[in-house]
A protein has these predicted regions:
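RNA-contacting regions in translation and RNA-metabolism proteins
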Residues: 1-169
Length: 169
């Protein structure tokens, strides 16, 4: 498994001087280190994880966001048992995100497994912008408990102020 920290550090749980320096200078975050160590620990027990590349990690509240390559996201989402194992390892809610994705794709990852019908950027008279996302009523019922988390994650990670519009079926 490829991670933001070197393989030896991810396996041993301690940082070498090079990775320690990257952490100190801000090239790495504590979440990158934690995510790398936990996923490497899991990859020792599950060979499917060896093929993946973790680009970076972020934490928003109790939620852990793991940013992978686009091809890795599809693979992970097709393996429900593997996803459950990852969530157990991180002791909570894990969001799989595509690294370096444009805002629309970022929002699609947050709203997964439902589909976003429309997304529009609205410029308000006071100068700030709001992104409006449209979902169907049927889909909204699947994620209604997560909407506040989705809004908070979008705001903290990409500075997207989100407005969710629900359309009747």
């Amino acid at each position: 498994m490829k991670t933001p920290i070197c393989t030896f550090d991810a396996r041993s749980g301690t940082l070498c001087s090079l990775c320690e320096n990257k952490l100190r200078t801000g090239q790495l975050t504590q979440e990158d280190v934690e995510g790398s160590i936990r996923l490497t620990k899991l990859s020792a027990r599950n060979q499917d994880l060896d093929k993946l590349t973790l680009v970076n990690s972020k934490r928003v509240g109790d939620d852990f966001l793991l940013f992978f390559r686009a091809s890795d996201i599809n693979f992970l989402r097709s393996k429900e048992i593997l996803m459950n194992t990852i969530e157990e390892e991180f002791h909570g809610n894990v969001w799989l995100m595509e690294a370096d994705s444009p805002p629309r794709k970022f929002l699609e990852n947050l709203f997964f497994p439902i589909r976003i019908g429309n997304s529009n950027m609205i410029w308000l008279p006071d100068g700030h912008k709001v992104t409006q996302v449209t979902v169907t009523n049927k889909d909204y019922s699947k994620i209604s408990g997560k909407v506040d988390k989705i809004k908070r994650i979008a705001e903290e990670i990409k500075e997207i102020e989100l407005l969710v519009q629900v359309l009747g079926d």
